[in-house]
Amino acid sequence: RAYHPICEYLETLKWDGEERIRYVLKKYMGADDSDYVYEVLKHFMMEALLRVFYPGIKADEMLCLVGQQGAGKSTFFRFLSLKDNWFSDDLRDLGDKKVFESIRGHWIIEMSEMIAAISAKSNEEIKSFLSRQKDTYRTAYARFEKDRKRQCVFAGSTNTYQFIPFDRTGARRFLPIMNDASKAEKHILDDEEEARAYFNQLWAEAMIIYHSEENKGNLLKFTK
């Protein structure tokens, strides 16, 4: 496999044996300690791993954090990206020709403003966008367009609890987790160094799960 900075970084992580995927959203965001929260976050993390180890794999669901402004939702996704330059929250308009510049080189991309203003029309647009496994575009100075398999996943954050126009075809794309900052053990920015170390261990745990499954397709199955 060709050198990939995210893959190489992930492979260097050593898990200390402490379970964190189940508790991180409770700890920093005040989410419930439930099987649903655990399964949704684990699913999203497995999609993110598969997208860098197997670019272009199907990954059309979006983890959405729902809760009060100032709770640290965007910071959560930034820390989850491990390095700030692997994160982007610059995706504003899916119809913009520069949308691919917002995707390229990033691993986790937050779509906060679009989720907050979601409508039936934009819901269809977002579903279509999420379902793509590759993007075709021409970079600056290139002569021809080129297919590029996606290596990123998309996340959402909103302050609005009624943000999804539930319909038979699209609601499953959005996986909401409710947050309550008043129930968080600590704010995610109280100790950034500690939080970033916690997220490194979060991915170290995820890598153990990833390598334990020979059939990688099983990683995306909800077990409960």
Where are these regions (language model features)?
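Feature primarily recognizes SF3-like P-loop helicase cores of small DNA viruses
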Residues: A2, K58, N85-D89, G95-S122, ...
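P-loop NTPase catalytic core of nucleic-acid-dependent motor ATPases
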Residues: A2-R104
